[in-house]
Amino acid sequence: YIDFSIDSGHQTSATACGCYGLGDDGYWYLLDTYYYSPNEKPVKKAPSELSSDLFNFKRNMIKEFKTVTDKETIDSAEGALRNQYYKDYGVRLNPVDKGTNKEKLVDYSQDFIAKKKFRVILNNNNLIFKKENENYQWLPKSVESGKPTPDKTEKDLPVDERYYNTHSQSYAYTYADHTQDEFQYWVKDNLVKLGLKY
């Protein structure tokens, strides 16, 4: 089976969806990524278009890996896309309670990575995950204050790293932490399955 996890964006923030699966070798893999950034686009995708994109992404992954879906996760604070998806396809995305402690969410995902049972398939769509993962950091002032907050600033991608996502059929010119958020939601929603909680 495979899982999906969504960090839903708005007018200025990207929507990211990771597809995760357990391999025969016992490793968990990020198989593929849907990524749509509305930045620098005069006409932004509406929730109905994002809903359609995500459903088609799921359908393509199920077909490619010849399997079924176990869990579809989304940020509990996101209502518009969740409602649109249910209205369009009758599927209830599982709202994960991310809580108020971002540090705890990050700890869960770091604990999972520390188990050395997670790998990222090297394909073009997953490059944005790699980029955001390598550049994920706390805001220095927030660390000093004792309440660490991730840096959510949209940063420009270098010209030689122009990113095109085949599932959203669009370019992204900036990156931030969207794939890292959906990864954290996936880990939090699957603690038992991932061997982090018994």
Locations of regions flagged by a protein language model:
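Two-metal-ion RNase H-like nuclease active-site motif
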Residues: 1-11, 75
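Residue-level detector of short, conserved catalytic/binding motifs and their immediate flanks
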Residues: 2-4, 15, 70, 180
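Coil-to-beta-strand transition motifs
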Residues: 10-14, 26
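Catalytic-loop motifs flanking and including active-site residues across diverse enzymes
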Residues: 13, 81, 178-182
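Mg2+-dependent endonuclease catalytic cores in nucleic-acid-processing enzymes, primarily RNase H-like
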Residues: 18, 25-172, 193
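Short, charged alpha-helical segments
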Residues: 156, 174-184
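Short, hydrophobic/amphipathic alpha-helical patches that form generic packing surfaces
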Residues: 161, 181-189
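Acidic two-metal-ion nuclease catalytic site recognized across multiple nuclease folds
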Residues: 186-198
